[in-house]
Amino acid sequence: MQNDSAALVAGSSVARNSTADKVVYFPSCINQTMGLPKHSPVEQPLVNKMISLLQKGGYEVIFPKEMDKLCCGTIWESKGMLDIADRKAAELEAALWEASEQGKYPILCDQSPCLHRMRETIQKMKLYEPAEFIYTFLRDKLVFTQTDRPVAVHITCSMRRMGLADTIVSLAKLCSTHVFVPEEVGCCGFAGDRGFTYPELNSYALRKLRPQIEASGITIGYSNSRTCEIGLTTNSGIPYVSIAYLVDQCTKSVKAEATDNL
């Protein structure tokens, strides 16, 4: 896999515009380092796609300084290395505080499990994952055109804990006339990075997924956690990618729509 997004985020901001709304975008470690799989259904890494979608909605994208050294600490916490996890969380908080001009602008992280931990350790800023940010801030800045292509949606454990299950489903319904949430499929079993070393956990947790996908005829699924999407892709027979890709496919900026109607 290859990730060509580094050049886009090397600076502190993208497309400076003094009159635009601003958002601080912190791409998760996994989305900074992992590119697209060999047979990906999408053409851009998520970081690139998030930038273009935010700009479509009229936002100036700001990045924290030394972003490639920042981490929310989730991976360290999962290994029991709590001191390192807390230190990384503190470093991230300081960088986001500066980038957001002391909490003036919202913070977006593109991985729901990372955002969940950030909300547990950072209280003085407004933090969002993709589905909630898009639904809250971009919905009125974009023109949605529903596709008749049926799509599957996986609700991550962290989304359920944050009370955002309905948000990602509602967002998907703005994009597609047929949104399918498989029954009896809760936790995907990837469990952070354990799915890489214990794939049987992942396959057992998702044992009821593939039959439902095959029966429905759905060919693509959406979620908001890269590791979950890896396991879902492996065990469903269809690719799963970030919900941001679906939104981008089904939207135009309000400005572009107005121009088209002239």
Question: What is the predicted role of each segment?
Answer:
Residues 1-262:
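Iron-sulfur cluster-binding electron-transfer modules in prokaryotic oxidoreductases
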